[in-house]
């Protein structure tokens, strides 16, 4: 089973109890930056093998994850902050999971855009999220 796990977006204490339980229970963790994820895992005394899954190796990492899942391993996918797939790697992997009829689930976590909406004071019963602003090196 693949677990898509939400991680804190600033404060390491903002991780859910369920996310910590899953990270403790899986065989391996796929992450954007192993150094960054190691900091989170160390804060909760979690010792698991890590391997990179980022925008530069997502296709190869997805193939590796598929192989491990077919071997019966449980894998967690995390991003540096927030939810994988939301402006982070994971879309290729989920498409491959569906194509290979492999199970996955989402462990919710912190949400940057919901926090921003609430902090804005513009809260209403309707809102739309159309993505994050491009980074300073991107073309608009």
Report the location of each language-model feature.
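Glycine-rich, flexible N-terminal cofactor/catalytic loop recognition
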Residues: 1-56
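Generic beta-sheet signal
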Residues: 1-5, 71-79, 127
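Residues at secondary-structure transition points
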Residues: 14, 56-63, 88, 124
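Short, glycine/charged-enriched secondary-structure capping and boundary segments
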Residues: 18-21, 43-46, 65-67, 89-94, ...
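Phosphate- and divalent-cation-binding pockets in alpha/beta enzyme and binding domains
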Residues: 39-40, 85, 114-116
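Conserved helicase motor
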Residues: 52-59, 132-137
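Glycine/small-residue-rich loop that forms an oxyanion/phosphate-binding "nest" at active or ligand-binding sites
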Residues: 62-111
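Class I SAM-dependent methyltransferase SAM-binding "motif I" and its flanking Rossmann-like core
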Residues: 92-140
């Amino acid at each position: 089973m693949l677990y898509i796990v939400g991680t804190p977006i600033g404060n390491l204490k903002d991780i859910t109890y369920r996310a910590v339980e899953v990270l403790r229970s899986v065989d391996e963790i796929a992450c954007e930056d192993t150094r960054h994820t190691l900091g989170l895992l160390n804060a909760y005394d979690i010792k698991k093998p890590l391997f990179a899954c980022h925008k530069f190796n997502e296709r190869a990492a997805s193939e590796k994850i598929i192989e491990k899942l077919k071997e019966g391993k449980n894998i967690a996918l995390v991003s540096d902050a927030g939810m994988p797939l939301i402006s982070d790697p994971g879309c290729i992997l989920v498409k491959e999971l569906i194509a290979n009829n492999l199970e996955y689930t989402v462990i919710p976590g912190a949400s940057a855009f919901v926090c921003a909406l609430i902090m804005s004071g513009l809260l209403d019963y309707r809102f739309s999220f159309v993505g994050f602003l491009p980074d300073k090196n991107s073309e608009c």
